[in-house]
UniProtKB/Swiss-Prot annotation:
Its cofactor is Mg(2+). It comes from Mycobacterium tuberculosis (strain ATCC 25618 / H37Rv). Disruption phenotype: Deletion of the entire CRISPR-Cas locus (cas6 to cas2, Rv2824c to Rv2816c) decreases resistance to plasmids encoding spacer elements about 6-fold. It comes from the Bacteria. Belongs to the CRISPR-associated endoribonuclease Cas2 protein family. InterPro entries: CRISPR_associated_Cas2, Virulence_VapD/CRISPR_Cas2. This is CRISPR-associated endoribonuclease Cas2. Mg(2+) binds at D33. It is an enzyme of class 3 (hydrolase). HAMAP family: Cas2.
Length: 113
């Protein structure tokens, strides 16, 4: 698969499912606050398989419903009571503007494991 810059990845045209009329992918933002270093690193590794790290404790991704379900299932198995993990789903056309230390990142299509 060809590599795309971070900017190209998030500005891909969204495909509409003809049968249901729904948009095929949604923008997802995952933020977290985990005090244990080992657990925090483990979660970051999980999230890196789905999207881009944009801050120390924040990842962005464009996911299908199925991919989102896999992500939620992995986080559900991972999370414990003292963790604070939030998943924000933005459906439809989402414009992302970044300032400051935002940088373009090249990445290949993500592999789920």
């Amino acid at each position: 698969m060809p590599t795309r810059s971070r900017e190209e990845y998030f500005n891909l045209p969204l495909k509409v499912d003809e049968s249901s009329g729904t948009i095929g992918k949604m923008f997802v933002l995952v933020i977290y606050d985990i005090s244990d270093n080992r657990r925090r690193a483990s979660l970051a590794k999980i999230l890196a398989g789905f999207g881009y790290r944009v801050q120390e404790s924040a990842f962005e991704a464009m996911l299908t419903k199925g991919q989102l379900a896999k992500l939620v299932a992995r986080i559900d198995r991972f999370a414990i009571d003292c963790d604070n993990i939030r998943i924000y789903k933005i459906r439809g056309v989402a414009a992302v503007t970044f300032y400051g230390r935002g940088r373009l990142v090249s990445a290949e299509e993500f592999v789920f494991f």
